[in-house]
Design a protein with these regions (language model features):
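Residue-level recognition of specific faces of alpha-helices
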Residues: 86, 93, 100, 126, ...
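Conserved catalytic-core motifs characterized by acidic clusters
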Residues: 32-48, 73-87, 147-163
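FAD-binding core of flavoproteins
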Residues: 1-68, 72, 82, 177-182, ...
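DHp/HisKA dimerization-phosphoacceptor four-helix bundle of two-component histidine kinases
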Residues: 58, 89-99, 129-136
């Protein structure tokens, strides 16, 4: 209800609430100012790093769910008299997914512990690494799961397609994967 503020909803593939905000001669009274003058960028970055960690953790959960559903499917689905998961090609893909999930979890846990240990520090590189790894991995694991499940992976009945839709936007929110790579690179002086 602020004068000069207009909000326009955007329909999205995943059904998530996304809006455009328009500010036209919008006045913010002193009582509504958040933080101290001149510290807006630092506050914004702290918020973005928190958002990145939340997205990383959320997508790690989505990836684990997709992995679990895929694993159950390849154990149950039979071809040529045995579970499809017993074939080397799928077994190796499952092994790679499991390994990457564990690596992502270790990174996520390590960054979260570091943030807890030093609350005032921004941890831009580390938060970007966790967000990049966990969101890209979630997208990869859901696509792999969908592929291994064949037509069932695409069907709404099994839920893999819904998991995939949630992963697509995660690589955009909080800064795209390319932005995360740029942030990480800059922290190494590049």
């Amino acid at each position: 209800d602020a004068e000069g503020l207009q909000i326009r909803g955007i329909d999205t593939m995943g059904g998530k609430d996304v809006n455009d905000l328009y500010f036209t001669n919008c006045f913010v009274p002193d009582s509504a100012v958040v933080g101290k003058p001149g510290e807006g960028w630092r506050q914004l970055m702290a918020g973005l790093n928190l958002e990145r960690m939340i997205l990383a953790a959320l997508m790690q959960g989505v990836a684990r769910r997709a992995f679990s559903d895929t694993l159950a499917y390849v154990r149950e689905r039979e071809q040529f008299g045995r579970p499809v998961g017993s074939f080397q090609a799928l077994k190796h893909r499952i092994a790679d997914m499991a390994t990457e999930l564990e690596c992502a979890q270790l990174l996520l846990d390590d960054v979260a512990a570091a943030i807890d240990a030093e609350p005032g520090r921004l941890f831009a590189r580390e938060a970007s690494m966790a967000k990049l790894k966990c969101t890209e991995l979630a997208k990869h694991v859901t696509l792999e799961g969908m592929q291994m499940m064949g037509g069932y992976g695409y069907a709404t009945e099994y839920g893999m397609e819904a998991l995939l839709r949630s992963t697509v936007v995660s690589t955009v929110y909080g800064g795209t994967s390319e932005i995360q790579r740029d942030i990480i690179g800059k922290t190494y002086g590049l």
